[in-house]
């Protein structure tokens, strides 16, 4: 009976899983595999990326395929057969081809890695579409080696596997390239990714691995998010309880909102410990922490809350509860009232909009398949395959940036090899000015003419780059001739669009490699008057005049210093005197005219008092008339 009770949670979980996914669509994430030799099987094929190890996202790997004569399923250690696959110095890495069957995929890869293989190809033993090689579920013994697998692996179809075996058995050297450069879309300068996680810390090996990853990846995630390089969103898988079982003990203990949102019992024991509904409530709380933090422009606070909750509120210490969660929320300065409002009432017979959105998001759209594996990482709408480990996941994120837009964290020596350090990546460079067209990227390098101090270089980036536009002469003299002597510097750079390099006055040449001084004296270009004495200088000339003469450079002639000074002085004196005379004459004429006018008017006024003037009419004398 006790054994039956142990299986009940799993039977219920199966019913919960199947119900919402009766039309589930699991997408196998693939990478490209190209056979370069022999000619008979040359071509490109698809392979399914294994969900363990470290795929080289954003990169590629070339190697030679080997098919072992013994232990062909790689279920035993190759050391038992005295077989090693370590590459000899100067040789290509070894890609081990093994057969599917008899043991876990991960064990096959682990045994191959210990024998020195650089990658593993697993040939399917069934004619079927490609599937994803996953890790064993809740297997403690396998967990010990799974976390140590560092080489990539891929599943190939049965038909292609047979072709590889035939070529190898025929004595051909089979070389191929594994290419992960297009495994993740890289459309722009921002990567969108999501992590499907769980707050349950008692679900075994995978939960421990997930908790460790969140703790290790927190720093890198927050750097990327704060810099605007990524847009992260957490998700939590939930299922619903079939309507016929909503009143059962199992549904009541594992679900909230009347069976709408459920999670498995952490201890797989309904009579003790925490219930599945406790996990659902905490999952909901963590979703609301992200939502509230995102509304305040600080979505990265989710990482702080989740890691602090793991440390302060573990199930094994009986602290996995609301009180402990609220203490973490308070310590991070998050508004607990907004969290409560977001969570709603878990006992209400209503849809919870936050959890309903999570259930809808589990169903794949476009190129992204349904989320059925926990944990699942989705990068630019493609599910990540491989080890959930900081450097491996960071490589996947970095491969999602458009080339040359990656943040600095993606270009560290731990993440990629700087190809510009080897022969400048084959790009153009100006060693004297320390300028290069090689730009290191996560995928490799690009040759692009640079912008230096605001000056744009133009060219193909490989063999030619030259400064252009305003200010180009400040960069290595625009690639033109330049020389300095005795404190005098000359440059042939001209800030014009039509002319790039032109020797300055006093020089002749192509302006690029050479400008020679013109001997104005010898070539009789200046200082040629009879009284002139010419002396050539670098970039110019000196001209002196005999006697007391002065050289006029603009007119290339000599004039007398003294004569010119005396003439100038007398001219000035006569000019002043003439000006004064004219001023005096003008003043006299004005004065004479005004005075005469004034005197005439005064005399006429006096005379008008005693006698009539010709210009005035006769005035009658009334006094005399009265006397008569």
Curated annotation (Swiss-Prot):
<protein>
    <recommendedName>
        <fullName>Vacuolar-sorting receptor 4</fullName>
    </recommendedName>
</protein>
<keyword id="KW-0472">Membrane</keyword>
<keyword id="KW-1133">Transmembrane helix</keyword>
<feature type="glycosylation site" description="N-linked (GlcNAc...) asparagine">
    <location>
        <position position="294"/>
    </location>
</feature>
<keyword id="KW-0106">Calcium</keyword>
<feature type="disulfide bond">
    <location>
        <begin position="503"/>
        <end position="515"/>
    </location>
</feature>
<feature type="disulfide bond">
    <location>
        <begin position="473"/>
        <end position="493"/>
    </location>
</feature>
<feature type="disulfide bond">
    <location>
        <begin position="427"/>
        <end position="447"/>
    </location>
</feature>
<dbReference type="InterPro" id="IPR018097">
    <property type="entry name" value="EGF_Ca-bd_CS"/>
</dbReference>
<keyword id="KW-0325">Glycoprotein</keyword>
<keyword id="KW-0333">Golgi apparatus</keyword>
<dbReference type="Pfam" id="PF25011">
    <property type="entry name" value="VSR_TRX"/>
</dbReference>
<feature type="domain" description="EGF-like 3; calcium-binding">
    <location>
        <begin position="517"/>
        <end position="559"/>
    </location>
</feature>
<comment type="similarity">
    <text>Belongs to the VSR (BP-80) family.</text>
</comment>
<comment type="function">
    <text>Vacuolar-sorting receptor (VSR) involved in clathrin-coated vesicles sorting from Golgi apparatus to vacuoles.</text>
</comment>
<feature type="domain" description="EGF-like 2">
    <location>
        <begin position="469"/>
        <end position="516"/>
    </location>
</feature>
<feature type="domain" description="PA">
    <location>
        <begin position="56"/>
        <end position="168"/>
    </location>
</feature>
<keyword id="KW-0813">Transport</keyword>
<dbReference type="InterPro" id="IPR046450">
    <property type="entry name" value="PA_dom_sf"/>
</dbReference>
<feature type="topological domain" description="Cytoplasmic">
    <location>
        <begin position="591"/>
        <end position="628"/>
    </location>
</feature>
<dbReference type="GO" id="GO:0005802">
    <property type="term" value="C:trans-Golgi network"/>
</dbReference>
<dbReference type="InterPro" id="IPR026823">
    <property type="entry name" value="cEGF"/>
</dbReference>
<feature type="transmembrane region" description="Helical">
    <location>
        <begin position="570"/>
        <end position="590"/>
    </location>
</feature>
<feature type="glycosylation site" description="N-linked (GlcNAc...) asparagine">
    <location>
        <position position="434"/>
    </location>
</feature>
<dbReference type="InterPro" id="IPR001881">
    <property type="entry name" value="EGF-like_Ca-bd_dom"/>
</dbReference>
<feature type="disulfide bond">
    <location>
        <begin position="420"/>
        <end position="438"/>
    </location>
</feature>
<feature type="domain" description="EGF-like 1">
    <location>
        <begin position="416"/>
        <end position="466"/>
    </location>
</feature>
<keyword id="KW-0245">EGF-like domain</keyword>
<dbReference type="Pfam" id="PF02225">
    <property type="entry name" value="PA"/>
</dbReference>
<feature type="glycosylation site" description="N-linked (GlcNAc...) asparagine">
    <location>
        <position position="148"/>
    </location>
</feature>
<feature type="signal peptide">
    <location>
        <begin position="1"/>
        <end position="24"/>
    </location>
</feature>
<keyword id="KW-0968">Cytoplasmic vesicle</keyword>
<keyword id="KW-1015">Disulfide bond</keyword>
<dbReference type="InterPro" id="IPR056858">
    <property type="entry name" value="VSR_TRX"/>
</dbReference>
<keyword id="KW-0653">Protein transport</keyword>
<dbReference type="GO" id="GO:0030665">
    <property type="term" value="C:clathrin-coated vesicle membrane"/>
</dbReference>
<dbReference type="InterPro" id="IPR003137">
    <property type="entry name" value="PA_domain"/>
</dbReference>
<feature type="topological domain" description="Lumenal">
    <location>
        <begin position="25"/>
        <end position="569"/>
    </location>
</feature>
<dbReference type="GO" id="GO:0005768">
    <property type="term" value="C:endosome"/>
</dbReference>
<feature type="disulfide bond">
    <location>
        <begin position="449"/>
        <end position="465"/>
    </location>
</feature>
<feature type="short sequence motif" description="Tyrosine-based internalization motif">
    <location>
        <begin position="610"/>
        <end position="613"/>
    </location>
</feature>
<dbReference type="GO" id="GO:0005739">
    <property type="term" value="C:mitochondrion"/>
</dbReference>
């Amino acid at each position: 009976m006790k054994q039956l009770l142990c299986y009940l949670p799993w039977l219920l979980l199966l019913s919960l899983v199947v119900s919402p996914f009766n039309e589930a669509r699991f997408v196998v994430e693939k990478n490209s595999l190209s056979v370069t030799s022999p000619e008979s099987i040359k071509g490109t094929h698809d392979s399914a990326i294994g969900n363990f190890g470290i795929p080289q996202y954003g990169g590629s790997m070339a190697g030679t395929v080997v098919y072992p004569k013994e232990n062909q399923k790689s279920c035993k250690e190759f050391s038992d057969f005295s077989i090693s696959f370590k590459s000899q110095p100067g040789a290509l890495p070894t890609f081990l081809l093994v057969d599917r069957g008899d043991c876990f995929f991960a064990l096959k890869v682990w045994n191959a890695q210990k024998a020195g293989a650089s990658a593993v190809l697993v040939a399917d033993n069934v004619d079927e579409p490609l599937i994803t090689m996953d890790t064993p579920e809740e297997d403690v013994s396998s967990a010990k080696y799974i976390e140590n697998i560092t080489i990539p692996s891929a599943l190939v179809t049965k038909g292609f596997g047979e072709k590889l075996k035939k070529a190898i058995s025929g004595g051909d050297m089979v070389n191929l390239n594994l290419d992960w450069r297009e495994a993740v879309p890289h459309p722009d300068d921002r990567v969108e990714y999501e992590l499907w996680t769980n707050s349950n810390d008692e679900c075994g090996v995978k939960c421990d691995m997930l908790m460790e990853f969140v703790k290790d990846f927190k720093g890198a995630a927050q750097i990327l998010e704060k810099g605007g390089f990524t847009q992260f969103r957490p998700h939590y898988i939930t299922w619903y309880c079939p309507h016929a079982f909503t009143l059962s003990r199992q549904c009541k203990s594992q679900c909230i909102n009347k069976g709408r949102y459920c999670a498995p019992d952490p201890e797989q024991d309904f009579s003790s410990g925490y219930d599945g509904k406790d996990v659902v409530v905490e999952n909901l709380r963590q979703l609301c922490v992200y939502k509230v933090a995102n509304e305040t422009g600080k979505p990265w606070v989710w990482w702080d809350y989740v890691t602090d909750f793991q440390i302060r509120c573990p199930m094994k210490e009986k602290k996995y509860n609301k009180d402990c969660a609220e203490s973490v929320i308070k310590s991070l300065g998050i508004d607990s009232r907004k969290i409560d409002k977001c969570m709603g009432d878990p006992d209400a017979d209503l849809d919870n909009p936050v959890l309903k959105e999570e259930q809808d998001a589990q169903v794949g759209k476009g190129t992204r398949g349904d989320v059925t594996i926990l944990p699942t990482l989705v990068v630019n709408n493609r599910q990540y395959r491989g080890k959930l480990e900081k450097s491996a996941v960071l490589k996947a994120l970095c491969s999602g940036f458009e080339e040359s837009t990656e943040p600095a964290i993606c270009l560290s020596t731990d993440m990629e090899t700087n190809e510009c350090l080897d022969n400048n990546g084959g790009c153009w460079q100006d060693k004297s000015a320390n300028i290069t067209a090689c730009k290191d990227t996560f995928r490799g390098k690009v040759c692009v003419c640079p912008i230096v101090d605001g000056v744009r270089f133009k060219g193909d980036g490989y063999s030619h780059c030259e400064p252009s536009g305003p200010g180009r002469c400040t960069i290595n003299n625009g690639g033109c001739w330049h020389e300095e002597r005795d404190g005098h510097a000359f440059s042939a750079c001209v800030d014009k669009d039509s002319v790039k390099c032109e020797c300055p006055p006093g020089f002749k040449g192509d302006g690029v490699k050479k400008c020679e001084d013109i001997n104005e004296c010898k070539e009789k270009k200046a200082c040629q008057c009879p009284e002139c004495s010419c002396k050539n200088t670098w970039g110019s000339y000196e001209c002196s005049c005999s006697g007391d003469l002065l050289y006029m450079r603009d007119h290339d002639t000599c004039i007398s210093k003294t004569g010119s000074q005396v003439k100038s002085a007398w001219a000035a004196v006569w000019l002043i005197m003439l000006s004064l005379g004219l001023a005096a004459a003008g003043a006299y004429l004005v004065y004479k005219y005004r005075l005469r006018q004034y005197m005439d008017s005064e005399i006429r006024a006096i005379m008008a008092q005693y006698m009539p003037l010709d210009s005035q009419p006769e005035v009658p004398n009334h006094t005399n008339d009265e006397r008569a």
